[in-house]
Curated annotation (Swiss-Prot):
The gene is truA. This is tRNA pseudouridine synthase A. The keyword Ribosomal protein does not apply. Its EC number is 5.4.99.12. The active site is at D60. It comes from the Bacteria. Formation of pseudouridine at positions 38, 39 and 40 in the anticodon stem and loop of transfer RNAs. Belongs to the tRNA pseudouridine synthase TruA family. Homodimer.
Length: 255
């Protein structure tokens, strides 16, 4: 069976995350993987056993994606562009397939990843903007962006990020490599945008890192408190977790 790799984008606001969730063998809530499975199986004339779409990243409820990657096998060979068009015809409006290509049978969307890039958008308006509430994390306290910029290099490199892992983390190790951590100001949009890139991230790691950086920006934490948090390996000391609404899976690299 030919294997396909697809790059998809989705508005995560109305999804309970990417990963399929079932109860008694039946899909219990709306998920991105669930929608993709339905479409692929419809295109394949509902084969038995059912085709399962495999995703690179299991984004949480409310998290968005510009560059999620999935793979799936079809029981017949179709031109990748035809697959893309067919999927987009059947998918709901909050999911779109931007690219499809043939890949080797041993390609795996999750296990072959080299690095992932995420962005986090923070709305800095004094009031909550109702039109941004599903697409940014709101933080109205005054921020010193220079303090945040001074703290970001402390995240770079390979560290034990146990202090930045939520209680649901199930990975064998909390050691991760971060290769990029920066922030851009968007004054015309009243936003700041964080970008993080690394080999992998722990459960809620980016949202917890953003929470710590925002507290550094307000002066609630010392500029280099990240160094201490890495050393103590204590999630309780990291405190604030930024909302899911501001997080976007931007790109996944397989090189």
């Amino acid at each position: 069976m030919p294997r396909y790799k697809a790059v998809i984008a989705y508005d995560g606001a109305e999804f309970f995350g990417f990963q399929l969730q079932t109860k008694n063998g039946v899909e219990s809530v709306r998920t991105v993987q669930g929608e993709l499975n339905k479409v692929i199986n419809k295109m394949a004339k509902n084969p038995s056993p059912q085709i399962k779409v495999v995703g690179a990243s299991r984004t949480d409820t409310g998290v968005h994606a510009f560059g999620q990657v999935v793979h799936f096998d079809l029981p017949f060979n179709i031109d990748p562009e035809g697959v893309r068009k067919g999927m987009n015809t059947l998918l709901p409006f909050d999911v779109v397939v931007n690219h499809v290509e043939h890949v080797s049978d041993d390609f795996h969307a999750r296990f072959n990843t080299h690095s992932k890039r995420y962005i986090y958008r923070v709305s800095t308006t004094d009031y909550k903007d109702p039109f941004k509430r599903k697409y940014t994390g709101h933080f109205h306290w005054k921020l010193d962006i220079n303090r945040i910029k001074a703290a970001l290099p402390d995240l770079l490199g390979e560290h034990d990020f146990a202090s930045f892992a939520a209680s649901g983390n199930e990975t064998a190790t909390t050691i991760r490599l971060i290769t990029r951590a920066d922030v851009d100001e968007k004054p015309e949009e009243h936003e700041i945008v964080f970008t993080f890139e690394g080999n992998a991230f722990l459960y809620n790691q980016i949202r917890i890192m953003v929470g710590v950086l925002l507290e550094i920006g307000t002066g609630k934490r010392p500029v280099h408190d990240i160094v201490r948090l890495i050393e103590v390996k204590d999630r309780e000391q990291a405190r604030y977790t930024a909302p899911a609404s501001g997080l976007y899976l931007d790109e996944i690299d397989y090189n």
